[in-house]
Amino acid sequence: MIQDEIKVSTQTLQWKCIESKIESKRLLYSRFAISPFRKGQANTVGIAMRRALLNEIEGASITYAKIKKVKHEYSTIIGLQESIHDILINLKEIVLKSESFEPQKAYISVLGPKKITAQDIKGPSCIKIMIIAQYIATLNKDILLEIELNIEKDRGYRIENLQKYQEGLFPVDAVFMPIRNANYSVHSFESEKKIKEILFLEIWTDGSLTPKEALYEASRNLIDLFIPLINSEKKEKNFGIEKTNESNMSYFPFQSVSLDIEKMTKDVAFKHIFIDQLELPARAYNCLKKVNVHTIADLLHYSEDDLIKIKNFGKKSVEQVLEALKKRFSIQLPKNKNYL
């Protein structure tokens, strides 16, 4: 019987948050358990997840501040308690969340006397300040302080060179690392007379996202790394060795089941990959979100003609989407519905 010939894996991974707490306003902690793994698998996943958490998750940060009539960062302003240098340090500590992949501008315009906090920062709706009570400066006199802030989204950290900035622009050593720490441990147990493993994963975040959100994003980023392998097409050269007799060469096993893999990729993997991974400009991204296109799978239901009919979605936005799909996932949308 066909049923007897098919071997189905009974190993279904399950995860559970077993501990969660707020250690401080800017430090969230959760501990997750993921199992069951076969022997050796938990360590492989643990290493990959920890590195993805620490290195692949984007964060938002202020990258520079523009203050008129100020020559250098150690300048002082009459009526302002802090030096410019102190203000820059305080700006660096502000925890932000950005829904845009494009640099954004925000502004501080305060008339003293007043204590200035992150709540006084005014910016676009795509920028969210996580701790509004974060201290910035104090005005002791009846003076106006105006600061323009540049906010970017990136990975890792960035130390700017002051010399490349014009007078009045002050770089901030930006930290784009919402994950403060990540650890894992592996423990063995016996199940059905077989040795299985359970992975414990600990995640600390700065509050701009929860540990659960971080776990999802790290998982999506790892999936993105392998999608191109699944979608890879035959090349004229394989690992740098020229094919002299194509009929005698053996290819990756993917190729013999390319149709099945393509269907699996569209039906399963793309449902878990959000359009954020396309890194589209804010205009194209926001237009897609307004018509409930949240994942790559949602986007695959559209043709080029469908996209251009979306409100405020111009030809340039269509080109940006097509280019991003081709670059990231080797996907080309059909011209019209007839080819879907």
Swiss-Prot record:
It comes from the Eukaryota. It is found in: Plastid, Chloroplast. One of its GO terms (biological process) is DNA-templated transcription. Residues 1-233 are annotated as: Alpha N-terminal domain (alpha-NTD). Transmembrane segments: none annotated. GO terms for molecular function: DNA binding; DNA-directed RNA polymerase activity; protein dimerization activity. Its EC number is 2.7.7.6. InterPro entries: DNA-dir_RNA_pol_insert, DNA-dir_RNA_pol_RpoA/D/Rpb3, DNA-dir_RpoA, RBP11-like, RNAP_asu_C, RNApol_insert_sf. SUPFAM superfamilies: C-terminal domain of RNA polymerase alpha subunit, Insert subdomain of RNA polymerase alpha subunit, RBP11-like subunits of RNA polymerase. GO terms for cellular component: chloroplast; DNA-directed RNA polymerase complex; mitochondrion. Keywords: Chloroplast, DNA-directed RNA polymerase, Nucleotidyltransferase, Plastid, Transcription, Transferase. SMART domains: RPOLD (SM00662). Residues 265-340 are annotated as: Alpha C-terminal domain (alpha-CTD). It catalyses: RNA(n) + a ribonucleoside 5'-triphosphate = RNA(n+1) + diphosphate. The keyword Transmembrane helix does not apply. It holds the Pfam family RNA_pol_A_CTD. The N-terminal domain is essential for RNAP assembly and basal transcription, whereas the C-terminal domain is involved in interaction with transcriptional regulators and with upstream promoter elements. DNA-dependent RNA polymerase catalyzes the transcription of DNA into RNA using the four ribonucleoside triphosphates as substrates. Belongs to the RNA polymerase alpha chain family. In plastids the minimal PEP RNA polymerase catalytic core is composed of four subunits: alpha, beta, beta', and beta''. When a (nuclear-encoded) sigma factor is associated with the core the holoenzyme is formed, which can initiate transcription. NCBIfam families: rpoA. This is DNA-directed RNA polymerase subunit alpha. The lineage of its organism: Eukaryota, Viridiplantae, Streptophyta, Embryophyta, Marchantiophyta.
